[in-house]
């Protein structure tokens, strides 16, 4: 079975009508994965052509941030019509309030959180029962009763801690974070500089509202790295540079 990324590559070579016809022939979860792996503009074109019910079922399966990106690319009337047919939009609606190129527009609201008074044993049981998305499992976020971000705990530290120790004892309170209104490039710079796989996003009063994963910003991070390389060579990113040209 082809990986969704490979399926996306195969579909992207087809005319738009064929793409629109092919996607619904896949299982819903598979089609949602393929749509996530397509170029954003291409995914938007397909989404604009799919039947409302089909698109709604795919968006229900997708990560909230990916679903929000597609909805923002649709004209408002179609986006509202699709959302009416979705099973739930609770995790998607907050993301639609932010510009696509900001932290709020890039983040996912599905965040594994722990309350500071939890014991390690209680926290592990809670995670086992809630089954949060594995995409966000690099770190768990510790909050107070008002959901204000206090610290982070690595899954390894949690598992190896004494069962009776409280989460606030083993958490790291020195947390790199970004504001919901920060530009995506600033977030990419933070993640690249500190070698982060996840970046917690907070609002103006330090409440945890979401998290950005490396995958969410990989293209932005790569673009930043390319710009740095060109800057070192005193070239613009639009320069016509042929690295294989002979030295005169």
PLM region spans:
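Hydrophobic packing positions in regular secondary-structure scaffolds
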Residues: 1-235
